[in-house]
C-alpha cells in the first residue's frame, strides 16, 4: 500500500496544478487521533471545485492517483444510490490502497464544513476558511439517552422479538435471522453502549459498527454477545435469541437504574 505521505502528496500535487480545485480536505479515520494507524485505512478526500461536470465527464484525471482495479460511483448507481451530497469516486488501486474522492462545489464550502467535524484542511488556495479547524470525533461520541429514547429502544427490542419467535415457529429461519440481526442486535448494541457511557463517560466513540466495544466491556459480557452470532440452525437461533434477551434485560436494568428511568414491562 502507498505510505501516507506518498498518497497525500500525489493528491495535493494534482490539486495544486488544477485551477478548478480550490480547497482539499481529508476526512474520516486518518484525521482522528483516537484511531490507531494501520495500512488498511482509506483516504477520504474531498475536492471543492468551481465546476464538477468536467471532472465527471472525463475520468482520465483519476489515473494520477494510481492504477484503478475497481471503482464505484454511487451517484451513477441505481441499485445503491448515493446518500451524501456531491459526486464520489470510490477507488481501489492495484496496491490495495482505497481512495474515496468526493467532488463538491466550492460555493457549498460553509455547508460542507458543518456536516462533519472530523475534517482536516489540506489545501485552501483562496484563504476561504477563516477559522482554525481542528478535527474531532465528538459527533460520534456515545450519547446519553433521554427517558424517551431509552423507552423507545426497549420497546423496539421487545416488540420485534416476537417477529423472531414467529419466524422460528414457522420454520422461516432467514426471516428470523434477518430480524434478529437488523433490528434486535442494533438495539442491544445501543443499550450496551449506554452502559459503557454510564461507566466510562460519554466523551468518546466506540467506533463504526461498535468495533471498539470489546475494549470497554467485561470479557464475560463480550463472550456472551459473541455467542449470539452463531445462528446456523434453529437450535442455535433459539439460543441466540434467548441470550440476546437476557443480555438486553440485564443491561437495560443497569442503565435504567443509573439514569433513574422507569424500567418498562415490555418483557413481561
Annotate each predicted stretch with a short phrase.
Residues 1-19, 27-38, 46-102:
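Metal-dependent nucleotidyltransferase catalytic core
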Residues 38, 120, 211:
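Flexible, active-site-adjacent loop/turn segments at secondary-structure boundaries
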Amino acid at each position: 500500500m502507498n505510505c501516507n505521505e506518498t498518497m497525500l502528496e500525489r493528491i495535493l500535487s494534482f490539486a495544486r496544478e488544477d485551477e478548478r480545485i480550490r480547497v482539499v480536505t481529508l476526512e474520516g479515520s486518518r484525521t482522528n487521533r483516537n484511531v490507531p494507524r494501520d495500512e488498511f485505512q482509506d483516504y477520504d478526500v474531498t475536492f471543492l471545485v468551481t465546476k464538477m461536470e468536467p471532472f465527471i465527464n472525463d475520468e482520465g484525471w483519476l489515473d494520477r492517483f494510481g492504477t484503478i482495479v475497481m471503482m464505484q460511483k454511487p451517484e451513477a448507481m441505481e441499485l445503491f444510490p448515493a446518500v451524501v451530497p456531491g459526486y464520489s469516486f470510490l477507488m481501489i488501486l492495484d496496491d490495495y490502497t482505497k481512495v474515496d474522492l468526493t467532488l463538491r462545489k466550492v460555493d457549498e464550502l460553509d455547508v460542507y464544513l458543518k456536516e462533519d467535524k472530523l475534517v482536516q484542511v489540506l489545501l485552501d488556495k483562496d484563504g476561504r476558511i477563516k477559522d482554525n479547524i481542528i478535527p474531532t470525533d465528538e459527533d460520534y461520541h456515545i450519547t446519553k439517552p433521554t427517558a424517551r429514547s431509552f423507552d423507545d429502544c426497549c420497546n423496539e427490542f421487545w416488540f420485534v422479538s416476537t417477529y423472531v419467535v414467529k419466524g422460528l415457529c414457522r420454520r422461516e429461519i432467514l426471516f428470523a435471522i434477518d430480524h434478529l440481526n437488523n433490528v434486535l442486535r442494533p438495539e442491544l448494541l445501543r443499550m450496551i453502549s449506554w452502559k459503557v457511557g454510564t461507566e466510562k463517560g460519554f466523551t468518546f466513540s466506540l467506533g463504526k459498527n461498535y468495533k471498539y466495544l470489546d475494549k470497554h466491556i467485561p470479557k464475560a459480557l463480550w463472550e456472551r454477545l459473541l455467542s449470539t452470532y452463531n445462528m446456523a440452525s434453529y437450535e442455535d437461533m433459539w439460543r441466540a435469541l434467548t441470550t440476546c434477551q437476557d443480555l438486553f434485560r440485564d443491561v437495560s436494568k443497569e442503565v435504567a437504574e443509573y439514569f433513574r428511568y422507569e424500567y418498562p414491562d415490555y418483557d413481561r
